[in-house]
């Protein structure tokens, strides 16, 4: 077993009184030097449960900078859907996340809070970390700003679910 390996097993029963969740996952703030990403999932562009028709399933590499979609009005962006594996690394060390069931991930220099509170992309301030999200599920993107709300089939409304994944940090030899 690798030193520091974490086998996460999160079982959830959502209270009916609780509002719908837009997403469920784990958010980590990692060393900003972990700037290279490699993943097996939908790519190379961002992809969501309702926005992946132009994406292909495969092995991709990108810098964290390139995973961010620079929309004029900041918003949720850069997620990669239907992943089995993601690795963030640099020349000395890295971290790997894998799972038997597909997950989504997002690696960015911007927090979700920063994206929500700013109205123009030039106002964004980078975090001191890589903001790394490993998600069991997210709502679809929809188009409520210029079209319909998220369709029911793309709404995350699970009441009982279990999210299992393995996280392995490593140092290159």
Stretch-by-stretch model annotation:
Residues 1-173:
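Beta-strand/loop-rich accessory regions of lumenal/periplasmic or secreted enzymes
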């Amino acid at each position: 077993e690798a030193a520091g390996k974490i086998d996460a097993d999160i079982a959830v029963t959502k209270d009916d009184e609780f509002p719908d969740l837009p997403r469920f996952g784990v958010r980590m703030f990692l060393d900003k030097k972990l700037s290279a990403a490699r993943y097996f999932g939908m790519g190379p562009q961002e992809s969501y449960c309702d926005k992946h028709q132009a994406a292909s399933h495969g092995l991709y590499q990108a810098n964290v900078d390139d995973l961010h979609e620079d929309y004029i009005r900041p918003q949720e962006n850069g997620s990669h859907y239907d992943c089995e594996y993601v690795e963030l690394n640099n020349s000395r060390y890295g971290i790997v996340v894998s799972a038997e069931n597909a997950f989504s991930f997002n690696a960015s220099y911007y927090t979700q809070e920063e994206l929500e509170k700013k109205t123009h992309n030039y106002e964004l301030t980078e975090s001191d970390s890589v903001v790394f999200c490993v998600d069991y599920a997210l709502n679809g993107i929809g188009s409520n700003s210029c079209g319909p709300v998220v369709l029911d089939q793309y709404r995350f409304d699970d009441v009982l679910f279990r999210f299992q994944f393995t996280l392995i940090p490593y140092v290159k030899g």
